[in-house]
């Protein structure tokens, strides 16, 4: 019993970052659903229509588009950041590689092929397509998640937009027609600009500010010009 309890504690401790943010995500998503349901029903009441139940709202295009438009911008942020930091640098930022290390680096630095270690992922030690794929897997998956969530946003957005058009006795549009509307790009670009601003702020502020104990910060006593080191 004691050993099992220790194993459980160890699991929570070793995975606390993922678990904390995962639980926080579910809580905030639930709160968004509650708030969105109330707001949507207020609009339906103003339009003289029957309010939706909470279950009906959760399966509606309005809820889907509100969720997916935020997801796609987050995945885009990480996709651009992952690939951008391969070649782009910022002197003094722990978020950047050292200026002279810009680029994909050689196999020895990346522990690939003949330089793979016993604890390296299996595909890192191969010399075929598997190594090439695995060497770009993080950015590829982030890019794929961005495209899928962007597609989900556009499809859900089309349905939500057409529902609104019907309530106003106006013509509906096709998917291609919706993607060309100001509504779609307003939803999309307002999320993109906020994500890009957040990344730029993190890169610049981490040059001069510190957070003791955080790997996202340089050590408190590190010089402002120190690049690519973490606390």
Question: Can you annotate each of these PLM segments?
Answer:
Residues 53-60, 112-127, 174-181:
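Short membrane-interface loop/juxtamembrane segments of multi-pass integral membrane proteins
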């Amino acid at each position: 019993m004691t050993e099992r309890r220790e194993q459980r504690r160890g699991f929570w401790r070793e995975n606390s970052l993922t678990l904390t943010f995962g639980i926080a995500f579910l809580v905030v998503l639930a709160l968004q659903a509650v708030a969105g349901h109330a707001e949507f029903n207020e609009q339906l009441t103003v339009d003289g229509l029957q309010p939706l139940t909470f279950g009906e709202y959760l399966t509606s295009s309005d809820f889907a588009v509100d969720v997916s438009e935020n997801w796609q911008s987050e995945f885009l942020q990480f996709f651009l950041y992952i690939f951008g930091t391969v070649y782009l640098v910022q002197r003094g930022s722990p978020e950047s590689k050292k200026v002279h290390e810009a680029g994909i680096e050689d196999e020895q630095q990346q522990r690939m092929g003949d330089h793979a270690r016993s604890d390296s992922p299996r595909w890192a030690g191969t010399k075929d397509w598997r190594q090439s794929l695995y060497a770009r897997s993080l950015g590829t998956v982030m890019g794929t998640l961005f495209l899928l969530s962007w597609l989900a946003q556009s499809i859900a957005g089309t349905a939500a937009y057409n529902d609104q058009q019907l309530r106003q006795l106006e013509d509906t549009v096709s998917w291609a027609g919706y993607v060309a509307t100001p509504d779609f790009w307003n939803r999309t670009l307002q999320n993109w600009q906020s994500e890009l601003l957040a990344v730029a702020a993190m890169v610049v502020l981490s040059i001069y500010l510190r957070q003791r104990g955080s790997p996202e910060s340089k050590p408190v006593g590190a010089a402002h010009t120190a690049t690519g080191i973490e606390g």
